[in-house]
Amino acid sequence: MNLSPREKDKLLVAMAAVVARRRLERGVKLNYPEAVALITDFVVEGARDGHSVADLMERGGAVIGREQVMEGVAEMIDEIQVEATFTDGTKLVTVHEPIR
């Protein structure tokens, strides 16, 4: 299987999001990379499902709460920018204060 660097990055984020979901199910608090991966995956998959940029910007901040991440993680993430593929092309989605 020949994957471009971008495709490899997408798979890495998706796998990290799977790990993050499993940890949340077990009640384990997420670290920085897991939290970012989970929110990023939400945005990418939401774009594929047909949601709008505005909708994903808003809903991206409700994926995980402060109580689900390790101490200090929420303060480390001011915004997350995700380049996602929508039905009408690739767009940049910015989620401000993604962990509330």
UniProtKB/Swiss-Prot annotation:
Family: Belongs to the urease gamma subunit family.
GO CC aspect terms: cytoplasm
CDD domains: Urease_gamma
Record-linked PANTHER family: UREASE (PTHR33569:SF1)
Swiss-Prot/TrEMBL keywords: Cytoplasm, Hydrolase
Catalysed reaction equations from the record: urea + 2 H2O + H(+) = hydrogencarbonate + 2 NH4(+)
Designated name of the protein: Urease subunit gamma
GO molecular function, one term: urease activity
Subcellular location: Cytoplasm
Enzyme class (EC, first level): hydrolase
UniProt-listed InterPro entries: Urease_gamma, Urease_gamma/gamma-beta_su, Urease_gamma_sf, Urease_subunit
EC number: 3.5.1.5
Pathway recorded for this protein: Nitrogen metabolism; urea degradation; CO(2) and NH(3) from urea (urease route): step 1/1
Gene Ontology biological process terms in this record: urea catabolic process
Location, primary (coarse class): cytoplasm
Pfam families noted in UniProt: Urease_gamma
Subunit structure: Heterotrimer of UreA (gamma), UreB (beta) and UreC (alpha) subunits. Three heterotrimers associate to form the active enzyme.
Domain of life: Bacteria
